[in-house]
């Protein structure tokens, strides 16, 4: 079996509790496969944010095992976490932009930190700002941007480096329906063309049918509902873009 088919992320009987409180996540076992698109849904308090924290390496489980990109997260030394995090793109619900940098420079950060050629940076950022409809705001600092504009900058920054996995927490919460669909198409393009695994947490039930072949992960009181077993098997063949993932 190839590493692709083994999955980017595998949870095995994972539980999470904070301190001595009852578990907020219980007995989670699933696999996120390379090049697949997932929606994470559930009522408020179902555990979505806690699950996302495990996925973007902000939290370790209280029990169980997690493997990501072939690495055992339980036994892996903490000093190796930054390298693993560089393979992730994360859009936080409470995102933060660098206040003294322009929209352009905020989006450029991941590429510049990776040492990318400046010509490539300028071209990539210009394309990304055009995609999210912010070309005219490229030189604006965050304080002068609306909440929705800031969110689009945060999304552009998260996807510009073509991460192996994109994790987005309520990414369309502050934008109008037209822009929400456009952002979803951006995630879909990243998924289809590059092979990025995408996980979008959302309360918007209207989004769930907008991406063909997407899988829905439903959390209920910290447990995952997967009656069809879809989260245990590859949903479709790997795409050409995954070969470099």
Question: What do the PLM-derived regions correspond to, one by one?
Answer:
Residues 141-145, 149-151:
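Conserved ABC ATPase signature
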Residues 101-109:
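Short coil-to-helix segment of the ABC ATPase nucleotide-binding domain corresponding to the Q-loop/switch region
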Residues 73-89:
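ABC ATPase NBD coupling module
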Residues 64-72:
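Conserved ABC transporter NBD signature motif
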Residues 56:
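Helix-to-loop junction immediately C-terminal to a conserved catalytic motif
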Residues 166-169:
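Catalytic Walker B motif of ABC-type/P-loop ATPase nucleotide-binding domains
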Residues 162:
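Conserved catalytic motifs of ABC-family nucleotide-binding domains
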